[in-house]
Amino acid sequence: MVNRWRGDVALVVNGQRRVARLTLGALAELEDALEEPSLVALVERFEGHRFSSRDVLLLLAAGLRAGGTEVSAETLAQAEIEGGPVAASQAAAALLARAFVVPV
């Protein structure tokens, strides 16, 4: 079940609905993989539209792993994501946004 307050985002991969979320560990993994020095730099990279399709794959793969699905960016690159690249980019943006939302 998707819990937006926990930062969950639903994504359909190869016909199966998956839940992704960005935990602190997933964010640290992304900083390392994308060679960004901080969380702020990571977010600014995406907010400033300076990201690549590889960045989206790395973000989604980290989020899916944190949500309980073991997948690499390389495997995800070969998978069918429902909605294609647009849906993948939207899911990546939602993951980042929800990771920093404070529940009220």
Where are these regions (language model features)?
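Charged interaction scaffolds used for protein-protein
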Residues: M1-V12, P37-R54, R65-V104
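Short, surface-exposed, low-complexity cationic segments
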Residues: L24-A41
